[in-house]
């Protein structure tokens, strides 16, 4: 063997070791680059939980217009109820009990072919289950459509036929109407229950009766004291199904007359009437669009029927009927 063969052997042994090391390093690098991205990034702690997305908060301030337009039968009536409202959120809380809380002030206008009512209304909802509304209305009767007709006391017949026969005695006048309306409400899943008590005081200039004078009011459908109190209640049991609302309403009215009115003697064989009434029946509402905001927000049609369980003039098969249409318009809304 040539003399230079021995030095070539170690060279042949050492020279391939470097390429093998480089190849091994390259292979490890390739394996590292080919690993999944999740394996390259630190994992979050096992105990960490992602919070659910929070519901968008209610507007902190809101200005809106709302209107309800109704037509009634038994008794007959037509009325447009309108309010311009400034509303302020009370609590910025995710709590179900505190989230939908607010205070508001509004200018209210009610229009009818027989009258208008104008005045301020304040409303506060400190809890989702409690609402309180109070207001004042200046009332102007036009003397049209048989309104108003007044009586010397609370014990006069006032059914539709009699009032129609005495339409010529109707006259225009004005007065004042104060009211406080506490309401309790609750909702479990799709079932809601609410009850509203109206405490009203009337002071109307009448031609008859002095302090015992009364007048017929078609909204309350009873003889209202010219200077005195009326209590009313609406209780609704509702099923809320998206755009549909189905349920039942119980309504009652209790006029409160001056104590000396009991001095009036009834006709022979008749008892002194209380002019209270009670009715119950179905309620159906459909909202064409339930999304808030916009020029015409939540346009809704409403139908109510009520059979009289108690009434001086209307305990028969013909129910009270009401059809209505409501919507609101957001004018200003800010967080």
Language model: regions and residue ranges:
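Cleavable N-terminal export/targeting peptides
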Residues: 1-60, 292-295, 314, 328-335
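Terminal non-domain segments
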Residues: 26-27, 38, 228-230, 237-239, ...
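Outer-membrane beta-barrel initiation region
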Residues: 40-96, 207
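Outer-membrane pore/translocation modules
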Residues: 42-50, 61-65, 129-239, 258-280, ...
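Transmembrane beta-strand segments that form the barrel wall of outer-membrane beta-barrel proteins
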Residues: 61-72, 100-113, 120, 132-135, ...
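Beta-strand elements of well-folded, non-transmembrane domains
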Residues: 88-90, 126, 199-201
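Short linear interaction motifs
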Residues: 98-105, 113-115, 177, 218, ...
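Compact, well-ordered interaction domains used in eukaryotic information-processing assemblies
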Residues: 115, 121-127
